[in-house]
């Protein structure tokens, strides 16, 4: 919570309501904070903006020979909550109640809102040399010289919109790219071998929770 406060992502809240906070263990043993917004989501008018179809995205990458994959740093947290709506995001912790100034994970409209933003700012480049899936951005080109110019345009858009990438999760000007569980190289699309291995080694689900985790992996 201190990190979120220091970053200006949350502030103390006086709202008479709030969502509970849960913690989920990640693969490296650290904990991920999750906020249970189910009650809020039930009364939220759903944003019907369509999430891109994965198959359509792969079709656009097939003829490219150079790729850069960009990962936005804490993507949702780069989107400001509308003024006056902050109390709706209140969560209750052992240290008190806090409300988000940026878009938290767990809101039903968060993916569609973020997708709308990405498609809006990259609209001139979509279907030409950029594909976007939520906070994953792939820049693709047929030649290296062309790729450098495409990257310049993309970075200019990110700078103008004050969006920041996580450099350690990015790959620049590569002859192949791994995107949404697939490896794309020489105009061909292959399943990511790490995904195949994970499916093969997955223990048979013993309950509903484990089944959901498995379905999430293979989807």
Named regions from a protein language model:
Residues 1-219:
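Retroelement reverse transcriptase polymerase core
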């Amino acid at each position: 919570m201190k990190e979120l406060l220091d970053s200006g992502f949350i502030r103390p809240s006086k709202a008479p309501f709030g969502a509970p906070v849960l913690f989920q263990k990640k693969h490296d043993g650290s904990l991920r904070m999750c906020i249970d917004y189910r009650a809020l989501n039930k009364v939220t008018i759903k944003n019907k903006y369509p999430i891109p179809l994965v198959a359509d995205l792969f079709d656009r990458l097939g003829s490219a020979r150079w790729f850069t994959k960009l990962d936005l740093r804490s993507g949702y947290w780069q989107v400001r909550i509308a003024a006056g709506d902050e109390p709706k995001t209140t969560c209750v912790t052992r240290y008190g109640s806090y409300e988000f100034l940026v878009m938290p994970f767990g809101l039903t409209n968060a993916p569609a809102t973020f997708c709308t933003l990405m498609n809006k700012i990259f609209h001139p480049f979509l279907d030409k040399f950029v594909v976007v899936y939520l906070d994953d951005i792939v820049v693709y080109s047929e030649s290296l010289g062309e790729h450098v110019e495409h990257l310049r345009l993309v970075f200019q858009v990110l700078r103008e919109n004050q969006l920041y990438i996580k450099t350690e999760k990015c790959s620049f000007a590569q002859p192949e790219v791994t995107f949404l569980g697939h490896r794309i190289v020489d105009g061909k699309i292959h399943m990511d071998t790490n995904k195949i291995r994970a499916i093969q080694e997955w223990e048979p689900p013993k309950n509903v929770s484990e089944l959901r985790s498995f379905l999430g992996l293979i989807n």
